């Protein structure tokens, strides 16, 4: 931490101590640069105003010698334009002083997590952020915590989420983090297998059990012995087979199709659906007793549109992988493409993002993804809707009228809150540039300070 005011440095140290972070505090830019000769930090918190040089000078020096070290600027209200400029030169983020404890912790935690992810990907090509996942949004942090807590248990996990959110990736993450990680992970898609074959796929069959059964065959249950059995799109399973599945879950035993012998296996059940499982129970399409057997630990995967900055993290990770695979040289997205990605709803979630990027990489060349390369519907003008929604009174009176700046302030503050503090994303929804929001925040903060004097 580069902060020349001792009391502020001590306060911020107390905020970050619960994270278990080792913090080295220096008071000048020269000391900060010199300290890099002895120890390279995971993150630098840098004040813009220092007694011997500017924060921008320190930024340039650090980026020249250690370009991979992430830097977060801390700035007073009057220095926001400088902070925005600093981000253009390599700063990862900036915080407005005075900074609240929660905001500081989240920003620092995210920056360290992202830096660790990038380092791991450089050391181990193809390695992802967390057990195959990419993303550090608060919604995904909750998913990671649930996986960490539940992985070691044998309790059944029921994953819900829209199509394309990564339910199988989640199931694989649970398996990899469990004590069964070195045992088989067997997935069966209940929606992709014909009704008359799914029992055989699940439990296996003996020779002659039905037309075409020329040999004995192991099913998914037997193949998963000792490991994890993942039942994807479980709510598509026929009710008759649900009865047999319930018995299998209760006893750990099953019969192959055409056999009278019982087989016993030890499997951990993970299942998933893109429907509401309880609604399926209420409408008679899913057995209630099976629901209670499997719905022990619910785990909901958020849609991509609710994951904030994860969209761009995922996009960059996929771009690097696909460019290498297709022999292309793409390395970045144009700013208007980033804004389009952030404002788009992504009804097909991560799977749609994968398809969009594959289309772009295969059909185009260059180093930068530009707006004209986007396929439909992303190449169409975006009709934006304000994230901030106001309830209009039926009849407005003079007393209901607010100053225009106050209405604007409410809209911006609500948009920032809805976007989890992501100002560039909020700006995209409001159809203004991020710098416009920063300037307005600066003006309102100055107004508040004058009123408090």
Swiss-Prot record:
Boundaries of every Sigma-54 factor interaction domain copy: 133-362
SMART domains: AAA, REC
Keyword presence, tRNA processing: no
Phenotypic consequence of residue 4 to K: Constitutive luminescence
Domain Response regulatory as annotated: residue spans: 1-112
Positions that bind ATP: 161-168, 224-233
Signal peptide (UniProt feature, chain positions): none
Keywords: ATP-binding, DNA-binding, Nucleotide-binding, Phosphoprotein, Repressor, Transcription, Transcription regulation, Two-component regulatory system
In-chain residues carrying the UniProt-annotated modification 4-aspartylphosphate: 47
GO MF terms held by the record: ATP binding; ATP hydrolysis activity; sequence-specific DNA binding
CDD domains: AAA (cd00009), REC_NtrC1-like (cd17572)
One GO BP annotation of this record: phosphorelay signal transduction system
Function: Acts negatively to control the expression of luminescence. At low cell density, LuxO is phosphorylated, and together with sigma-54, causes repression of the luxCDABEGH operon. This repression could be indirect, LuxO could activate a negative regulator of luminescence. At high cell density, LuxO is dephosphorylated and inactive, therefore the luxCDABEGH operon is not repressed and light is emitted. LuxO and sigma-54 have also a role in activating the production of siderophore and in regulating the rugose colony morphology phenotype.
NCBIfam families named among the record's database cross-references: LuxO_transreg_Vib (NF041946)
PANTHER family reported for this sequence: PTS-DEPENDENT DIHYDROXYACETONE KINASE OPERON REGULATORY PROTEIN-RELATED, TRANSCRIPTIONAL REGULATORY PROTEIN
Name of this protein: Luminescence regulatory protein LuxO
Taxonomic placement: Bacteria, Pseudomonadati, Pseudomonadota, Gammaproteobacteria, Vibrionales
Gene: luxO
